């Protein structure tokens, strides 16, 4: 047995019932990192997007409800995953981007290598050996896990311990349906780059195959609806279907090009950018509107209740860029202020208020309904409270990281305590407190703070 691989650690989070979707409303320690579990800075492409980039990085995943935590630790010259206090087996390497928690926080999976041999590790059990492997996904009920892996020259899609017939090229991006009874994944069958979108039962006995033109298919947040792009001769169109009736396809209008399939945060409203006769349009549920001239490289957002789309219009001149927020399918209004960049657009639940991150003179601010808040060295990911009366976001100033609570006008109500690292924010069920994970020294903790 390898030293340090099988012991049980302290500070184990309390067990959570299966798929508990209530945010933990009490502050508590989730994990205590042992002194011999070194932090090891990963390559820049593996920085966790869910957190502000810290001064020294450890790959950490925290359940969005506060019900579990996993991290990659370096012990000596090898690596292991610590999940809810249990230390896993040591490997030569563990790919940080593969580390994933189940929705209930009680299961963990990741990709690991010993020498040149790859494994998928699920709840401490090795799957393999493989010559390569892809990404991993848990089902919404946390009972199933899907991943793609290579044996010899063939790739296979797995759900739990069952694999499909395989393909010579690769599979990618398994997504489970809302009721965890079906799985959708991308299949490339030959070197010509023909993509097939497969929707199957979990035993790969019944499936529907759809030939598509792009790898970027989309699934809505509730995992009830799937959308992809078809190409017929020289024209492109969107096709979509519900998991409950995958055989009933809905086909959109034909365009010269289609990109950025985007669902609303809730529901089935679908938007995308389409090109027709050299002009760009934003299409929302089959309604189209001509976009202002410019570029549209950044993600856009569908407003709640199908009220329109918020999209940044970007203009480039050499190395200089400028951007402003455009509200499509909305009454004509004065153009929003131009900034160097705009990002992380969000709306209140009723769609009446919006906020986003803007950069001006190399400083960051949150713009709320067109009004600038205070400027910081960095701000990310604003979120409105459920009642739309408060806004919270993560900020960095003078190398200190903290959460800010602001009113609907962007005025700061309180600045919460600083920590070494802060993860994305959410709200307790009553909407009166903000909750988030932090790393501070050797502790990973769940913090809950009143909004006022």
Name each region found by the language model:
Residues 9, 17-452:
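Non-catalytic tandem-repeat scaffold regions and their flanking low-complexity/translocation tails
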